[in-house]
Amino acid sequence: MAKDTRTRKKVTRTVSEGVAHIHASFNNTIVTITDRQGNALAWATSGGQGFRGSRKSTPFAAQVAAEVAGKAALDYGLKNLDVLVKGPGPGRESAVRALGAVGYKINSITDVTPIPHNGCRPPKKRRV
């Protein structure tokens, strides 16, 4: 006879305001939706949605990732989002638009791309 497996009920909490962190690199786009304290509620990546290789870095892949993360965070009762965009990737604007299309009211969009004050030496230029 099989043992009864006890599954713990997932504790759902309601959060009215959150922060969407969009990390858009040249190779991938990562969308993380957190509460105000920074605790992750939902996340998605372009690569995790089935896009591989150079298709990961397209605006459409970033849009799909933002939609998936946005719909997953709707379970927490989120209504308003502040958007923090980091990185120079091609999926920056399309991810923000996708979050608005899911149904969130976007309060602010902030660019938090780290800019060095002459820090590390950048990689050498490509010769194709």
Curated annotation (Swiss-Prot):
GO molecular function: rRNA binding; structural constituent of ribosome
Alphabetical list of SUPFAM superfamilies matching this protein: Translational machinery components (SSF53137)
InterPro entries xref list: Ribosomal_uS11, Ribosomal_uS11_bac-type, Ribosomal_uS11_CS, Ribosomal_uS11_sf
Keywords of this entry: Ribonucleoprotein, Ribosomal protein, RNA-binding, rRNA-binding
GO BP terms in the entry: translation
Alphabetical list of Pfam families matching this protein: Ribosomal_S11
Gene Ontology CC terms, in alphabetical order: ribonucleoprotein complex; ribosome
Homology family: Belongs to the universal ribosomal protein uS11 family.
Job of this protein: Located on the platform of the 30S subunit, it bridges several disparate RNA helices of the 16S rRNA. Forms part of the Shine-Dalgarno cleft in the 70S ribosome.
PANTHER family attached to this UniProt entry: 40S RIBOSOMAL PROTEIN S14/30S RIBOSOMAL PROTEIN S11
Subunit record text: Part of the 30S ribosomal subunit. Interacts with proteins S7 and S18. Binds to IF-3.
Protein name (database record): Small ribosomal subunit protein uS11
Organism: Acinetobacter baumannii (strain AB0057)
